[in-house]
Amino acid sequence: MSSFKHLSVNQLVQMTEAKSVQIVDIRDGNSFNNGHIDGAFNLNNENLAHFIGQADMDRPLVVVCYHGISSQNAAQYLCEQGFDDVYSLDGGFSAWHEANA
């Protein structure tokens, strides 16, 4: 079983420019609707099984939360579900928003 990796905001920018990447945002729906990384999917308990069933397990997957803490647990869980290349965004959406404001 693989383990997730940490990813900085700069690395995420490079990754999105270089290859096809899946981004899941685990923040609550209101926070997601108020702002999120382009192309991100709002992953929650209600749509988790559907997402796992439809997702490309071989594409890089970046997990985003508020500050980069909760995303680590979610990233590890997704590794355990069979995703091969999983990342947790250090600093979360807050860091991404600050870097892109």
UniProtKB/Swiss-Prot annotation:
Task: Tell me which UniProt keywords the record has, alphabetically.
Answer: Cytoplasm, Transferase
Q: Where are the transmembrane segments?
A: none
- Localization terms from the record: Cytoplasm
Q: Name one GO molecular function term.
A: thiosulfate-cyanide sulfurtransferase activity
Q: Does the keyword Cytoplasm apply?
A: yes
Identify the enzyme class. transferase
InterPro entries associated with the record:
GlpE_sulfurtransferase, Rhodanese-like_dom, Rhodanese-like_dom_sf, Thiosulf_sulfurTrfase
List the active-site residues: 65
Give the highest taxon in the source lineage: Bacteria
> Which reactions appear under catalytic activity for this entry?
thiosulfate + hydrogen cyanide = thiocyanate + sulfite + 2 H(+); thiosulfate + [thioredoxin]-dithiol = [thioredoxin]-disulfide + hydrogen sulfide + sulfite + 2 H(+)
**One of the GO biological process terms:** glycerol metabolic process
Entry's Gene Ontology cellular component terms: cytoplasm
Q: What is the official name of this protein in its record?
A: Thiosulfate sulfurtransferase GlpE
Q: Which gene encodes it?
A: glpE
